[in-house]
Amino acid sequence: FRVNNATLETEDHPQYIDVIKVLLNTPLAPGAQTEITTPFHVKLPKHFSRGGHVGQSYQATQWYPKPAVYDSKGWHPMPYLDQGEFYSEFGTYDVRITVPIEYVVAATGELQSAEEKQWMRERIQNTEFRIQNSEAASQKPKFLKPTPKKPAPKTPVKKSTNKAPLKSKKNVAKPAEAESKPAEPAIAAKPNATVIATKTLQFKQDRIHDFAWFADKRFVVDYDTVKLASGRVIEAWSFYPQKDTLWKHSVAMAKDAIHFRSKLIGEYPYNVVSVVQTKESGGMEYPTITNIGIMPDAKTLDMVIEHEVGHNWFYGILASNERDHPWMDEGINSYYGNRYVAWKYPEKRKRNWLESKIPENQTKLNVAIFAKEKKDQPISTASADFTEQNYAIIAYGKTSLWMKRMEEQVGQARFDSCMQLYYEQWKFKHPQPEDFQRVMEQNSGQNLTELFHDLHTQGAIQDYVGPKKIKPAFLYSMKDYERVNYVNFLPAMGYNMYDKFMVGLVLHNVSMPSHTFQFMLAPLYATGSKQFNGIGTLGYHWNPRKHFQNIDLSVTGARFSTMEGVDSNGAKVHGGFHKIVPALRFTFKNRSLLSTVEKWIEWKTYLIGEKGFNYVMDHDDSVSYPTPGVVKNRYLNQLTFNITDYRKLYPYDAQIQLQQGDGFYRAQATGHYYFNYAKGGGMQVRAFVAKFGYLGARTSEKVSRSFLYQPKLTAVRGDEDYTYSNYFIGRSEFDGVASQQIMMRDGGLKLRTDLFAGLQGRSDNWVASMNFNTTLPKNLFPVDLPVRIFADVGTYADAWKKNAETSRFLYVAGLQVSLFKDLLNVYAPIFYSKEFRDNLKTAPEVNTFGKRLSFSFDIHRLNLRKIIQR
């Protein structure tokens, strides 16, 4: 950085890599000027966030050094954030962009070349030109001579401001020279290099605080003029890279936005407005120009164009500090977007059956959902402090509702008058929240203190508070959630090998916003066992503000068959289980809603009744036949502490669990850690350790009674799921496909050793294991495959004894296919310990590739309430 050809000292920011302090050699007095120059070079990355390139289409945004704003509150150095926009100083921009001659450039400000404007207008009328240029971006540019490569576009920039203007030291034409000529083709060449035909375009604009430009040789151009109420005529441009039936009306949409905002807020001060379609974008505003992604329909495109063009008033002209006060741009802008839709689309769209079950004001519903869970944030929250969801729901949505409430309180006519005065008084001056409040109060004649206080509070915006009616609804309904508690119903089905198909009904009140009392009941009639089964849960759900995020008190229950037989009379008999599980969970509150960590502690008591078979020998054929046995009851107390970090990189969870039953205890710890690979995919690592012991002396009776609870290394089968927490197709099967279902618990070695009890690594002392599974390298396959490599290794107490049945460490490795977001996993063991190989050879009937396969079906991991909330 230089001033008057003298190099300036700089200081790196201690935290932000993209912020630097430039130390002037002499102080800059109020009202004085200085010119700072610097060369800079930018390599546009593949498009991400707001800019970059997609093939040979370029989106140059946030691409040059900008001076921080110095206002009454001091300096505002700001790093680039994907969530959180900008606060920049006004100035006069004079920018020249050099590109290959066939490129169309859309940019902030007024294009100075009449010849280039005429060339673009010719593209509007030349249908053949449109068709040729709607082809893929891989078309080669027109060269004066053949060339394998073209240089990157050169983009000098000059910004004049009373603070710290910037310009490039290279290739900056003097204004008089630049304005005396239209844009002309030039020849860019280096010694021994291929010559490329280029052109240099100049754009100028005053009273703006940013500059963006977009270049694409496929751009189709539309153009019109807009006559404002004052009689001033401005230009309206639209650029899109292919024939698009939606975008053929984009100029008309931009004109409507200019007219609408100018009438309600104040006249648009610039002489040009442009909209650009870019593939990798949602919508992003810059002074006089906005880029918009591909939209699903014309109405959505119109709404997005109006929203982004509308930013010119609040982001562009008023230019509040939207990094600290995003509501002053995004929220107020969204309010006017709602008014635009009501004005232009007064007829209500016919809603389909599912849409009819939610309220028309979905913004209000979203605010209520997060407020009920105590996960909302005040409107006044800074951009960087918002969660991703709240940034959209609160900064945009709730603010628009708050503005509507102000309009209703003040009256629309007076409200519009106040907003026009606010605009006229503060345009190009960076108003603060207190300035906005002062203007609204002084010109409305009302004390709005209470209303503006709501900017700093949490909670829903309610139009009704009172008793609610109870109404039935098929599937679900949230249509009138403020006035009605819905009891929802829908058909239910189930299947296992003993009950066969089950049909029934789900009754629930799981909804959004969540209820304090929640229930879900699913009675089922089993066509096989001819009995009523089912599952259900009743619970209370609290969201205190302090200490805990949630407190959940619940009781769940279930009843199903787990075995089937035929008695001596040829009649089918069934055995099964029922359980009742009271639970109390405390989910700890994080200091910040931005935290990705979830911590909870939970107590459960399993009260389980099981009915098996007694076997009676028939004297006629000397065959033992099953008869229904008596119900045997057992219990299990369980205390669990869990911590999970859902961060994008290296997420993990860890769980410590203590269990106690009749005469025994079991303590275990399980951890998962995901190592992300730089090029996508990653490795999941699981660690497990368990300690088992007896309450009192170890006796043969206790050993037998607690055998089911003892940890083991190899795959856990259905009849070893002692809490009945997993879904099994055939819980008690020992052959067939159903017998190959396992669950991920204990050591997790994915090899079934049903015939070899001594090889299962079971212990009434301790067990430890590590499990790994990794995605395949991305560069090996053209598409992502749901195939992984797994490897398991473990040890247990008895393996360290003298004359142990197995080696100290057992291992299994192979391929894993994961489907439906890991709900269904299929495991194919290929390499495994010598003990496994030798023993499997003695049982050829199970030692085939197909019989060694196993699978897990982890439907128990689904949480209906959490799915709905997300």
Q: Where does each model-flagged region fall?
A:
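Outer-membrane beta-barrel initiation region
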Residues: T449-H547, S592-T596, N614-Y650, T753-W766, ...
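Transmembrane beta-barrel strands of outer-membrane/channel proteins
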Residues: F40, P491-Y495, L505, L521-Y525, ...
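Hydrophobic alpha-helical and helix-loop surface patches within well-folded domains
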Residues: I20, K167-S168, K174-A176, F203, ...
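C-terminal outer-membrane beta-barrel translocator/porin domains of Gram-negative envelope proteins
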Residues: P491-M493, N533-I535, G539, N550-V573, ...
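A surface-exposed beta-strand-loop module
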Residues: F1-Q56, P175, P182, A186-A189, ...
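Hydrophobic helix-coil surface modules that form long, contiguous segments used
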Residues: P67-W75, Q83-N126, S138-E306, Y335
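Outer-membrane beta-barrel "beta-signal"
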Residues: V817, K821-D822, V846-R870
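Solvent-exposed loop/turn segments connecting transmembrane beta-strands
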Residues: F428-P431, A492-L505, V510-T516, L521-G534, ...
